[in-house]
Amino acid sequence: MLIFEHSRKNRLNYSQAPATRPAKNNIPDNLKRKSAPLLPEVSEMDTVRHYTRLSQKNFSIDTEFYPLGSCTMKYNPRACNALAMLPQFLSRHPLAPEDTGQGFLACMYELQEILKDVTGMSAVSLTSMAGAQGELIGITMIRAYHEARGDTERTEIIIPDAAHGTNPATAVMCGYKVIEIPTDRDGDVDMEALKAAVSPRTAGLMLTNPSTLGVFEKKVAEMSRVVHEAGGLLYYDGANLNAVLGKVKPGDMGFDVIHMNLHKTFSTPHGGGGPGAAPVGVADCLLPYLPIPIVAHEQGVYRWLTEKDRPQSIGRLSAHMGNAGVLLRAYIYVRLLGAEGMFRIAEYATLNANYLLAELRKLGFEIAYPSRRASHEFIVTMKEIKDKTGVTAMHLAKRLLDKGFHAPTVYFPLLVPECLLIEPAETESKETLDRFVVAMKEILDEIDTQPEMVKTAPHNMPLRKIDDVKAARELDLVWNPAG
């Protein structure tokens, strides 16, 4: 039920004093509304009940384990929210004089420096407002680099078949042809295929490490050498940075540019359509092209670097700095952790993943790439179970909802049939992981004894089955008061 359907004429929320006439007179006539907005008329109590009921219908990291692979659904510390919402931050206008915002600029500068240090990059820009935009920035800078050298024949970007879908989309948006290379049977990029793919047309390689298969690319140094010798650059998709934070730096692996998903590794909130943030770091070769503004610290004063300071920059990617509130939350998070805490992130994330992998293997679940240690996530394949019983990965995922857990990522990566991509972030306790194992055992037993119970799940959700085809073909995105 929509909030508008609760609306009753003249049923108002709390009132406030109307604007005085002088205040109204300050608004130009062409900016004044000609008619009242179509807002619902609902009491405060009904409003609270409506949104509370909606929240109870949704899964959330605040209520239960959320093992969504390749998403790093870690807990968002409330201290980060509380400090980022201090009036001194919220009341700061982005266009206010720099000397009135030195505290905020100091936070942004220190965040740039911390991200430089943990990634091994030479400089960082915070302006990107999403992971996909961070990718676009990175490949745009690679293009600018080659064009500045007069190397216009480089028209191809190499991408492994296990990559996130945004990688090829980004390359195409930047005008490149995508060259896909396969994964070998151990889960690594096929080196012979990479060597065959590089050429004078190679602009770069986009790589996630650890990959979406949940394994660390063992030959990343050799991959870097092959691409660089061909004149290309390496792009690091930072989606899985959480697995190696503080243990190995992308810069040391040979990458020239990286984006970092703050909503994953640095614990800013997920979802809701935003706001997001994905700072971009670069090696020396791409320094001139970083998007602006960037915070500089000169003679004890913080200031923005703009087009005048960086004439080769690819320009601005957001209205101003980007999503300041998200960046503040990430800064507070890393300061709360400190250097030692940041080292433990990868340790605990990897420990949780390998513990869960071992427990599910004991139950009889088939693990993809069984000879490899999980980096931070791992893949269960249900192909054999499906062949024997007809129960699919999607069926199991739906049944997990009845057990009180959000489902893992299903059917990604596409390389593994009937797969569940499971990622327990470092913030989950052993007790939580054990409860998840119990739920998985219960479902495995149900597959043997009452498979229809699993096939027809979920049974306890407010909405049981969704018509995916109807939802895609008959979009209903805007409320209309006329019905």
From Swiss-Prot:
GO molecular function, one term: glycine dehydrogenase (decarboxylating) activity
InterPro entries: Aminotrans_V_dom, GcvPB, GDC-P_C, GDC_P, PyrdxlP-dep_Trfase, PyrdxlP-dep_Trfase_major, PyrdxlP-dep_Trfase_small
A Pfam family hit: Aminotran_5
Keywords: Oxidoreductase, Pyridoxal phosphate
EC number: 1.4.4.2
GO biological process: one example: glycine decarboxylation via glycine cleavage system
Keyword Oxidoreductase set for record: yes
One GO CC annotation: glycine cleavage complex
Family note: Belongs to the GcvP family. C-terminal subunit subfamily.
PANTHER family on file: GLYCINE DEHYDROGENASE (DECARBOXYLATING), MITOCHONDRIAL (PTHR11773:SF1), GLYCINE DEHYDROGENASE, DECARBOXYLATING (PTHR11773)
Protein name: Probable glycine dehydrogenase (decarboxylating) subunit 2
Organism: Nitrosomonas eutropha (strain DSM 101675 / C91 / Nm57)
